[in-house]
Amino acid sequence: MALHLHRAERTDLLADGLGALLADPQPDPFAQELVLVAARGVERWLSQRLSLVLGCGPGRADGVCAGIAFRNPQSLIAEITGTLDDDPWSPEALAWPLLAVIDASLDEPWCRTLASHLGHFATTDAEAELRRGRRYSVARRLAGLFASYARQRPGLLAAWLDGDLGELPGDLAWQPPLWRALVTTVGADPPHVRHDKTIARLRDGPADLPARLSLFGHTRLACTDVQLLDALAVHHDLHLWLPHPSDELWRALAGFQGADGLLPRRQDTSRRAAQHPLLETLGRDVRELQRALPAARATDEFLGATTKPDTLLGWLQADIAGNAPRPAGRSLSDADRSVQVHACHGPARQIDVLREVLLGLLEDDPTLQPRDIVVMCPDIDTYAPLIVAGFGLGEVAGDCHPAHRLRVRLADRALTQTNPLLSVAAELLTIAETRATASQLLNLAQAAPVRAKFGFADDDLDTITTWVRESNIRWGFDPTHRRRYGLDTVVHNTWRFGLDRILTGVAMSEDSQAWLDTALPLDDVGSNRVELAGRLAEFVERLHHVVGGLSGARPLVAWLDALATGIDLLTACNDGWQRAQVQREFADVLARAGSRAAPLLRLPDVRALLDAQLAGRPTRANFRTGTLTVCTMVPMRSVPHRVVCLVGLDDGVFPRLSHPDGDDVLAREPMTGERDIRSEDRQLLLDAIGAATQTLVITYTGADERTGQPRPPAVPLAELLDALDQTTSAPVRERILVTHPLQPFDRKNVTPGALLGAKPFTFDPAALAAAQAAAGKRCPPTAFISGRLPAPPAADVTLADLLDFFKDPVKGFFRALDYTLPWDVDTVEDSIPVQVDALAEWTVGERMLRDMLRGLHPDDAAHSEWRRGTLPPGRLGVRRAKEIRNRARDLAAAALAHRDGHGQAHDVDVDLGDGRRLSGTVTPVFGGRTVSVTYSKLAPKHVLPAWIGLVTLAAQEPGREWSALCIGRSKTRNHIARRLFVPPPDPVAVLRELVLLYDAGRREPLPLPLKTSCAWAQARRDGQDPYPPARECWQTNRFRPGDDDAPAHVRAWGPRAPFEVLLGKPRAGEEVAGEETRLGALAARLWLPLLAAEGSV
């Protein structure tokens, strides 16, 4: 028996060679063949490829792949070392005894560094608890390091057991005694001893394995793996099927074969033999593998070069195979799109571009099928939602983008992305470890299994979000839950606080001026929402119970039981596989831990454990199903496809960022053959280049999607572009690198030849329509409305409509059109209020003022606001509440001094002439006076409604003495402003003028902003120049917003419109003596009668 080495530039040649080998039957017809594969995706492809060779008739490809066991190398190693069922030295199993050893050794002098890291010497309970929560994650990380030492440098562990520390840095001197204590605790042969015994056993006699074994598709093997394989080859035929990009490089490195694999990497000179730049920069893994392989081999076979197409990709592959660029005589043709690199604005645009490229390839080549295409992403979870949205929606997308007709199969996704119950489990752990914020619980309530459990519909969730916002829920279930943050005396803004408000709102209203303990009833709980309030309370109560069970220190089994109980209490699903998978994953965690999972764990420990368990993993079923395959770069990187797409090769993302573990002894002086994930990613790119048989498509973020700032490609991609420049006689970078515009509807996307090839780049009909519209005739921007709308039939006017219009005349125009202006979306806050800004102060003060006017004592009004949860907690909130209460109390006292008795409602019905009437109700009226009061600083928008009400009363009953008093805060701090008005001489004429303005303002936006127009009129009354004060009120500055910032004004005249938009000529019938501008004329008609009627208080 012997070791046989088979090499090829592509794995399809290796697969054919393996098929030829397996076609030679073994003596026992029932004996299984054993093939060890590097990844699940390779397994699926290899089985399909072998079925074209094995069991076929002459000239036919109708065979079957049977009698072959596909396994990964680690399962074989576990079998031959006797640890297939239970390996005490695997990182998952080793973490538990290591955790026990660490707990028992914290007081040992050698363990002081580790003990300090775990909070053993912490000076405060909070710090100690925080650091103790790292115990499992630290033990698991150290177990991984020890397993790495055992696999990649076993002599190191052997020396530590013998007391030889070698040149170990002083800051890592705690690791050898920890290792010795761990070996004593585990009680099994250390991994290096077990390894040596296994090698001796394999050399002495055959293992219980097939006589013929094959190892397929590997580009990196640890030194211990090579030693085991070498020993296994003594009594077995072991065939190594290695993809290697260059036979020339292999022969150039022949002198390195069988060399000591533990050469310091900085001393490795093998890169000098790599004459092609990509073999030098991307091929370190295969060079180091060649060094590690045994020199004694029965066969070292190169299976022949593949036929390369006469394209840029083919030239590149030929140069790599020949280990040198050979650009002479090569000229890139315009039609050659075999290598495409696309620079895009962020991940979403990369997917947009990818689907256009794929559709173009499918259109240009009718023989190309989706199964011939593979899409690989370094970060599959980032791109998976974008791919789902961009492809495969089928009938859901209707006649939209044709890429939706392509079916896509995603592989390697995290279990939390594919199983909603596991996603809920992860969210429960997050909530238990954090503050249970309003956003977190609302997000959890939107999860499909939770919605199904509690019957939350879309409208229900909108209502719940409104309740949470208005009841001022921020974070924490109750004061007890806040104890660890030192806020157990603060009940405000907790879920208990907000739910009490919601539930009391079922039975009583806020206006009842009653509360239960700290609960002020919430007004917005209608009688048709009582059941929803109960379901919300049930959801929060169950979640509180579950989170309470996810705390403290307890064994692993207790944690998993508590988490499973939480899932049962909070979710419902009709898909049995989801719950079965949860049970299976939890059982797998317990099985891995076995009887060693006795140490007590804390919540961060459990999160670290489950994060690893639920991470993305390859599965055989999701590869090569006839659809477009999307996966990470690991499982399919060496599987030949006609089109290979690499998406997301962004700088900082690829290669994966590698932060050396400060506790890793190997990282201090890495040796050849030892794993380096950045070098591994570079090898993945080299493998992917060789796997593309027709087209290589690469996308990356070449510009920031928000700022447009250019961004460089990933370094390996830049090296590929440099190599391509050396592949032909003239540089080709500018021809293969396509820089895409930000928007998919940019005219470049629809212009033939503007981006790629001679055809339009996009296949999206919507993008075409948008581009055509954008490229249409451009006209200068026009006004929002070019002229007045037709006058509606004259009709009666209600006082309520008139008052609404004069709150904001321009907004009144849009309201007449039923046009909704943009508004700020109210968001859910997660932070307890610690300060009260101007808007919040006005809201609180206005409420307190209204409560006092209704007869509530000022202290009770402040208490009511305290129970609302809008004020900061503790003394800060009390102080602010008193300040606001005092101002509101003074305003209320000033108003109540003029409000004798109960206010009366006066119905009015005024004949305006020409068959029109103004009708409505003025309330409240105290005797012959209306008294309005606001917490705001008294402004034109406050006095105008009072004036209109006064004029209406005077027109209704002209013989009675009427007046209107307006009270508010003065511009001078802590003073009260009062303005008194008496009726005009002819109130009906004033009403007619107001109605004329109302009619005009419903036909077009009137240049009549209230503050600006009032400032103009006041300046005219005082004999001053009206332009400066009016301009100051209109324009926004850095200290205050102006009228130009109002949403209605922005919509009518544009953002930051100049003051001159208000200064047109008066229309016919609007003229006023002395006014040459429309603003001046309208301001005079509206404000001068009011100003003339102002008296003294």
From Swiss-Prot:
GO cellular component: exodeoxyribonuclease V complex; extracellular region; peptidoglycan-based cell wall; plasma membrane
The keyword Metal-binding is assigned to this record: no
Keyword DNA repair: yes
Entry-linked Pfam families: Exonuc_V_gamma (PF04257), RecC_C (PF17946)
Annotated GO MF terms: ATP binding; DNA binding; DNA helicase activity; exodeoxyribonuclease V activity
GO biological process: DNA recombination; double-strand break repair via homologous recombination
Gene3D superfamilies registered for this protein in UniProt: 1.10.10.160, 3.40.50.10930, P-loop containing nucleotide triphosphate hydrolases (3.40.50.300)
Domain of life: Bacteria
Keywords associated with the record: ATP-binding, DNA damage, DNA repair, DNA-binding, Exonuclease, Helicase, Hydrolase, Nuclease, Nucleotide-binding
Annotated InterPro entries: DExx_box_DNA_helicase_dom_sf (IPR013986), P-loop_NTPase (IPR027417), RecC (IPR006697), RecC_C (IPR041500), Restrct_endonuc-II-like (IPR011335)
Quaternary context: Heterotrimer of RecB, RecC and RecD. All subunits contribute to DNA-binding.
Its job: A helicase/nuclease that prepares dsDNA breaks (DSB) for recombinational DNA repair. Binds to DSBs and unwinds DNA via a highly rapid and processive ATP-dependent bidirectional helicase activity. Holoenzyme degrades any linearized DNA that is unable to undergo homologous recombination. In the holoenzyme this subunit recognizes the wild-type Chi sequence, and when added to isolated RecB increases its ATP-dependent helicase processivity. Unlike the case in E.coli, suppresses RecA-dependent homologous recombination, is instead required for single-strand annealing pathway repair of DSB.
Family that this chain belongs to: Belongs to the RecC family.
Miscellaneous field: In the RecBCD complex, RecB has a slow 3'-5' helicase, an exonuclease activity and loads RecA onto ssDNA, RecD has a fast 5'-3' helicase activity, while RecC stimulates the ATPase and processivity of the RecB helicase and contributes to recognition of the Chi site.
NCBIfam families, per database record: recC
Protein's name in the database: RecBCD enzyme subunit RecC
Gene that encodes the chain: recC
